[in-house]
Amino acid sequence: FGTMADMDELIAESKKRGIGILIDLTLNHCSDQHRWFRAAKSSRDNPYHDYFLWRDGTPDCPPSGMRSVFGGSAWTYVPEIGQWYFHQFAPEQPDMNWENPKLRQELYDVMKFWVKKGVAGFRLDVIDQIAKEPDKDITINGPRLHEYLRGISENVLTDEGLVTVGRSWLLKNRLFQPQPWRP
């Protein structure tokens, strides 16, 4: 909590003491209260609609049987537009569609904002889940993951002094187990 002025002061005072501030970012999903998602669910024609993962369907039949990490379906129906959106976590945390280059650019811009403010880097939560393919039941370490990470590196992490930490809390349970989508 606090203001942007408070954050500016925290960054400046921390630097004076040789301490770097890392911003904790979740680039996989956002809040269902975020302006992008509110706009996205207002109309299939809204420019933000493709910032999220949507599938057609009827109210009583989700697009697949995928389960949320927290239990229940990984799909939530929006009757106003007759579509389901995908969420690996809570329904209040819709997953973003990293296949959309406009979304990626907006997320790069968010990160650049913080770099310009003077942060030392980022902790990227569940970063291994941005390249999902829900139609193939792939929600972690998807085929485009390295491409997306390279995009972050090339567009944002160009300052050699920046620190990045990626968190993968599902990987620890699957590291030495065969993946269902791999032979």
Predicted regions and their residues:
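Hydrophobic residues within beta-strands of alpha/beta enzymes
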Residues: 122-124
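Acidic/aromatic-lined carbohydrate-recognition and catalytic surfaces
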Residues: 1-108, 112, 116, 127-182
